[in-house]
């Protein structure tokens, strides 16, 4: 495997974005590396999916109609770990600059990913986040 290639086989990613094109392109990027992607359109759907499916990684847009990514990460972090409260998460957003990055990290996301994102950059961040997911590090390292 070349250094820029990531193996995401078996990594369950929950993607939330209200834009159909973004959902389709990001899901396709991650599936290229073997991730299993569940894509939803709203923060409410994402919160329910976190509790129901316990994804390994959460990728969320920040600006969505009704409730956005900040609302979502606040609700996720308020959950007990066994219900998804410790799910590793990244904000995938068009909001750029150090002030937005700082706000994202303070809110409870581990990464701030600026749109547009390259295939390999996205895969690397998801790979890093997956290593921090409960039970995933061993599964990834033994491949």
State the predicted function of each range.
Residues 34-41, 49, 113:
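Short hydrophobic/Thr-rich beta-strand motif most characteristic of the beta2 strand and flanking loop
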């Amino acid at each position: 495997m070349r250094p820029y290639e990531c193996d995401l086989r078996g990594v369950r990613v929950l993607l939330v974005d209200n834009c159909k094109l973004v959902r389709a392109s990001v899901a396709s990027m991650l599936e290229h590396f073997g991730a299993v992607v569940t894509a939803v359109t709203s923060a409410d759907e994402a919160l329910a999916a976190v509790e129901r499916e316990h994804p390994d990684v959460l990728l969320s847009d920040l600006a969505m109609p009704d409730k956005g990514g900040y609302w979502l990460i606040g609700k996720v972090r308020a959950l007990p770990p066994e219900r998804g409260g410790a799910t590793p998460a990244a904000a995938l957003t068009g909001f750029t600059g150090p002030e937005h990055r700082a706000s994202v990290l303070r809110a409870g996301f581990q990464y701030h990913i600026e749109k547009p994102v390259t295939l390999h950059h996205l895969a690397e961040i998801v790979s890093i986040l997956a290593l921090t997911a409960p039970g995933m590090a061993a599964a990834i390292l033994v491949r």
